[in-house]
């Protein structure tokens, strides 16, 4: 059993913001697989099979800074080990259009990942970072991540979400090393 959690903030005003890259990727994956989300574990949950294994998709509805609670609740209930958890989230340190898959690591200043580390009690879970780039001079970081993608960024976003879907699917079916070799370029 595996868990793929996409981080974001609930509510229409945040729906297409940079900070919701994790939600956006899971929405695209669920649409591709024709899955519906239902409320459970302080989040929205869908389930599917990948590579002969049950995989849960989770969009925590706790707001970003408390995302780990929802992830922990689902993981504990289904007895999913941290090594079988993938968290998808936005990363300002990567330029828009880049992905980076990691098997562990620090929060790197991301509050949703800080919460997940605290709730799981370990840094040893998979993460897929979706690059959103850094704000230009004069932009506050908090305002930047809560802003929508620009018209110019949308084609790049669409392409990277498609790549991200392929990366998490490969991770679920064949493991992280193969996915890292293919998508960390």
Curated annotation (Swiss-Prot):
Q: Where is this site: Discriminates between blocked and unblocked aminoacyl-tRNA?
A: 9
Q: Where does tRNA bind?
A: 14, 63, 65, 111
Say which domain of life the source belongs to: Bacteria
Q: Which UniProt keywords apply?
A: Cytoplasm, Hydrolase, RNA-binding, tRNA-binding
Please give a single GO biological process term from the UniProt record. Answer: rescue of stalled ribosome
Mind telling me which residues the site (Stabilizes the basic form of H active site to accept a proton) is annotated on?
Answer: 90
Q: What is its main location?
A: cytoplasm
Q: How does it assemble?
A: Monomer.
Q: Which HAMAP family match?
A: Pept_tRNA_hydro_bact
Q: Report what the protein is called.
A: Peptidyl-tRNA hydrolase
Q: Record the organism.
A: Desulfitobacterium hafniense (strain Y51)
Query: Source taxonomy lineage?
Result: Bacteria, Bacillati, Bacillota, Clostridia, Eubacteriales
């Amino acid at each position: 059993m595996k868990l793929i959690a996409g981080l974001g903030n609930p509510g229409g005003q945040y729906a297409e913001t940079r900070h919701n890259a994790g939600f956006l990727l899971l929405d695209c994956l669920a649409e591709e697989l024709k899955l519906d989300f239902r409320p459970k574990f302080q989040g929205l949950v869908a389930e599917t099979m990948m590579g002969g294994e049950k995989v849960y998709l989770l969009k925590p509805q706790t707001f970003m800074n408390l995302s780990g609670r929802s992830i922990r609740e689902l993981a504990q209930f289904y007895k999913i080990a941290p090594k079988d958890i993938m968290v998808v989230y936005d990363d300002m340190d990567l330029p828009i259009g880049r992905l980076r898959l990691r098997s562990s690591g620090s929060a790197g200043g991301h509050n949703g990942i800080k919460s997940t580390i605290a709730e799981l009690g370990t840094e040893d879970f998979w993460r897929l970072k979706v690059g959103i780039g850094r704000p230009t001079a004069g932009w506050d970081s908090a305002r930047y991540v809560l802003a929508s993608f620009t018209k110019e960024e949308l084609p790049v976003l669409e392409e990277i979400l498609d790549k991200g879907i392929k990366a998490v699917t490969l991770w679920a079916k064949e493991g992280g090393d193969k996915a890292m070799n293919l998508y960390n370029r």
